[in-house]
């Protein structure tokens, strides 16, 4: 399988997960805007660092691959919100944390 096919497979897996979670949570990710999504991305990065550094997975059935898929989806969610806000998309306004 070449890299393009690998990417398609990853994106399909991520889309399936997004559809399932969207059915459960709806548009909740948009509640706190881009900053909220960035905070969730930070949580997932810290989780991935913990898993790789300590080799410990404290959440059953959610390993490094699952965390990477979540990061993929959170990045897509942030892009959705950026597309909805042209000023931020064009970097014409500052985003304060």
Which residues fall in each region the model found?
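Intrinsically disordered, low-complexity regulatory regions
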Residues: 1-97
